[in-house]
């Protein structure tokens, strides 16, 4: 900070960094320098200054008294800081690497029953890019023993958590490189022995949480919906009761945010100044716990990079205070500083008390209504008749329970593929699990060998693959058909609709599908499929409500077994002349008491008005 020379002379002559080890009968500052020196592994008094990169942070004795401080102004010229060195200020620093177990204790902690526990830190390099739920479920699915991750968090690009026994750590070690991510890269898992995690050592007791809640209530202004937690650790009531609340500790920040969520989720303003915060990882959940927050004061802390703000950029802040953090020194001028902060908080109106120009908003707040989906598109009546006839035959066989009859529908060199949406959670627990192993979602699948293997070649392999898929019943009334390309030797069309599974674990589950066929003319004046792409997803609530509103008839090789020979002959003739299938032709004849002339007149009248559904022509 620009004013660092002054703050050093006023406060830092008493500064001491120390690990937060709780001992009975000792206050938080009664710690032996010699003991810490041995544990740090660096003898002598000339110990190198270093940030304690742990949850309890770099804690100064001066925190107990809120002395004067020169306010940092990012809009003025910054003096050179290089003249201020640690040895000029008579400060004593101790570095403790807590994830390295001290020789005399190993990675052991002590359980409540007095037995010894070995703790291990699990590190996943580049784990920050993975969703927590997906990552843990994938590790659990490959791990031979169940485990409970303690203190899962992200540290820079890494994901980390702790486990409390050697057998679990050994099982997790065996998972190393066994998991493929969505880009088909193997995930590394590193195991190190460790001291007990801070949430175990520094967990606030229930009675301490209640006291913290009481103190926060005293600091809350209901009329402004504002909570002032400035210099919380040095609060006189907390100090008097020997409750050490350090917001750099994950457990303390979690307890604070939980109190906010449970008691004042409508919070508009939060002051966290002068709490020596050097990272905001543990604050990320504030986006959900206080979604209405508009004003946030982080001044007088120790944030080094504006990237820390990425962890809370989901907040719709209008006012932010950052002065007094070293991150302000990293910008060459005022406009760069404002741009970097506004990139995270585009609705920001005030920064460090300065009014900002109104934000340029490109987002449209007003709700937009999507145009309604149109019906099928066939181009010509001849193509319509050809495609609907093909689909009627195809899905009658597909839903029959034996799909071997589809062999005649495919070309000898046909190919087929299936894809489903990417499943971030454990695929084995997804309702689409039966489709997952065959999914060729090229947006996520990068391995060319696997891409090729999941593409089914030749009609025998295609039909064998289709036979392995769950048995289905399609709602033909839901079909929307679009012809997208047509030449004299090729036809490309897609079908959208819904179906339900009729057996297995997902019986009666409703799915939506899109299927794209590329076909060539067949010898029987029909179509022969050369390419078949099937996309399956879970049906939406609207699709579920509309599905099977008119029950589709069960496919049968003899659709009119109860008719007399004369009626069957009339039915065949009417179906041929009208172009309708047997089911709808029979309905038309029955509605007109099997009077052929009246039925023909009714058909002509209804067709002219466009009141006959397309499904009536699917044969």
From Swiss-Prot:
3'-nitrotyrosine, modified sites: 126
Outcome following mutation: residue 595 to R: Suppresses FG-nucleoporin binding
Positions occupied by motif Nuclear localization signal: 67-100
Tissue expression remark: Expressed ubiquitously.
Coiled-coil segments: none
InterPro entries in the cross-refs: Leu-rich_rpt, LRR_dom_sf, NTF2-like_dom_sf, NTF2_dom, Nuclear_transport_factor_2_euk, Nucleotide-bd_a/b_plait_sf, NXF_fam, RBD_domain_sf
Subunit structure and binding partners: Heterodimer (via NTF2 domain) with NXT1. The formation of NXF1-NXT1 heterodimers is required for the NXF1-mediated nuclear mRNA export. Forms a complex with RANBP2/NUP358, NXT1 and RANGAP1. Associates with the exon junction complex (EJC) and with the transcription/export (TREX) complex. Found in a mRNA complex with UPF3A and UPF3B. Found in a post-splicing complex with RBM8A, UPF1, UPF2, UPF3A, UPF3B and RNPS1. (Microbial infection) Interacts with Saimiriine herpesvirus 2 TIP protein.
Effect on the protein upon substituting residue 71 to A: Greatly reduces RNA binding and no effect on interaction with ALYREF/THOC4
Residues modified as N-acetylalanine: 2
Free-text comment on this protein's domains from its UniProt entry: The minimal CTE binding domain consists of an RNP-type RNA binding domain (RBD) and leucine-rich repeats. The nucleoporin binding domain consists of a NTF2 domain (also called NTF2-like domain) and a TAP-C domain (also called UBA-like domain). It has 2 nucleoporin-FG-repeats binding sites (one in the NTF2 and the other in the TAP-C domain) which contribute to nucleoporin association and act synergistically to export cellular mRNAs.
Protein name: Nuclear RNA export factor 1
Any Pfam family the entry gives: TAP_C
Residue numbers bearing the Asymmetric dimethylarginine modification: 42
Stretches forming LRR repeats: 266-291, 292-315, 316-343, 344-371
Biased composition (Basic and acidic residues): 1-16
